[in-house]
Amino acid sequence: MDKRIILDDKAIDRTLTRIAHEILENNKGAHDLVLLGIRTRGIYLAQRIQSKIEKIDGITVPTGVLDVTQYRDDITDRVSQDVVAYKIDTDMNNRHVVIVDDVLYTGRTVRASLDAILDHVRPKRISLATLIDRGHRELPIRADFIGKNIPTALSEEIVVMLDEVDDKTQVYIK
């Protein structure tokens, strides 16, 4: 199957720098910010954004992991809702939580993320940052911070590769 590279490592770096600036501008600085990366690649994108925010604003933003497996609507065996689906060493109540994901597609993962967060805490605000928005939403969800809008056919797939997981950083469509 043919693959077409959309973003190389330098383009991804520039895109994440822009997203970091947009988050800071939207939040009027890094105060009260929390980044939660959706497993798996969203975690590393959140860490990269955290690093960029620290370079820009001099503040280390708390960053954590969000695993929405138990909240997905396509899984029938549910785990107890007492199990917290995120790992972060800070209180997220009354903070601006930014969910970070690699590809926004149907919106179902984001819906599960919202459920996972709101079952346990009450943030002041929740925003969504995504590297790629490919369209084809099934739910009324949109990203606040978008790296690239890449309209796709339903038969196409967007693949995000990151050094931390794949030993290569790029985004391609196949």
Curated annotation (Swiss-Prot):
One of its GO terms (molecular function) is RNA binding. A motif (PRPP-binding) lies at residues 97-109. Its EC number is 2.4.2.9. It is an enzyme of class 2 (transferase). It catalyses: UMP + diphosphate = 5-phospho-alpha-D-ribose 1-diphosphate + uracil. SUPFAM superfamilies: PRTase-like. Coiled coil: none annotated. Gene3D superfamilies: 3.40.50.2020. Keywords: Glycosyltransferase, RNA-binding, Transcription, Transcription regulation, Transcription termination, Transferase. GO terms for biological process: DNA-templated transcription termination. PANTHER family: BIFUNCTIONAL PROTEIN PYRR (PTHR11608:SF0). Homodimer and homohexamer; in equilibrium. HAMAP family: PyrR (MF_01219). Regulates transcriptional attenuation of the pyrimidine nucleotide (pyr) operon by binding in a uridine-dependent manner to specific sites on pyr mRNA. This disrupts an antiterminator hairpin in the RNA and favors formation of a downstream transcription terminator, leading to a reduced expression of downstream genes. Also displays a weak uracil phosphoribosyltransferase activity which is not physiologically significant. Belongs to the purine/pyrimidine phosphoribosyltransferase family. PyrR subfamily. This is Bifunctional protein PyrR. It comes from Macrococcus caseolyticus (strain JCSC5402) (Macrococcoides caseolyticum). The lineage of its organism: Bacteria, Bacillati, Bacillota, Bacilli, Bacillales.
